[in-house]
Amino acid sequence: MELSPELLRKLETLAKIRLSPEEEALLLQDLKRILDFVDALPRVEEGGAEEALGRLREDEPRPSLPQAEALALAPEAEDGFFRVPPVLE
């Protein structure tokens, strides 16, 4: 997939963000590298995947951050929930 500056501007509009020309250039480079990486994935040898999975730690439940502490870290909270800007108009 070819990533053009026009497509990047369309993505900016969809994401409702504004980037400076410098940020656009950097993001365009990063996205091209990511797409090249994803494009290369089908050509990667699959051997050794089982071995890699064995290295993961076990999932163990642990205490999480109390709700009051989590909400205290948020810019805005209301009635025990995070308050965020509307996504849909």
Curated annotation (Swiss-Prot):
It comes from the Bacteria. One of its GO terms (biological process) is regulation of translational fidelity. Its EC number is 6.3.5.-. GO terms for molecular function: asparaginyl-tRNA synthase (glutamine-hydrolyzing) activity; ATP binding; glutaminyl-tRNA synthase (glutamine-hydrolyzing) activity. It is an enzyme of class 6 (ligase). It catalyses: L-glutamyl-tRNA(Gln) + L-glutamine + ATP + H2O = L-glutaminyl-tRNA(Gln) + L-glutamate + ADP + phosphate + H(+); L-aspartyl-tRNA(Asn) + L-glutamine + ATP + H2O = L-asparaginyl-tRNA(Asn) + L-glutamate + ADP + phosphate + 2 H(+). Keywords: ATP-binding, Ligase, Nucleotide-binding, Protein biosynthesis. The keyword Metal-binding does not apply. Pfam families: GatC. SUPFAM superfamilies: Glu-tRNAGln amidotransferase C subunit (SSF141000). InterPro entries: Asp/Glu-ADT_sf_sub_c (IPR036113), GatC (IPR003837). Belongs to the GatC family. Heterotrimer of A, B and C subunits. Allows the formation of correctly charged Asn-tRNA(Asn) or Gln-tRNA(Gln) through the transamidation of misacylated Asp-tRNA(Asn) or Glu-tRNA(Gln) in organisms which lack either or both of asparaginyl-tRNA or glutaminyl-tRNA synthetases. The reaction takes place in the presence of glutamine and ATP through an activated phospho-Asp-tRNA(Asn) or phospho-Glu-tRNA(Gln). This is Glutamyl-tRNA(Gln) amidotransferase subunit C. It comes from Thermus thermophilus (strain ATCC 27634 / DSM 579 / HB8). The gene is gatC.
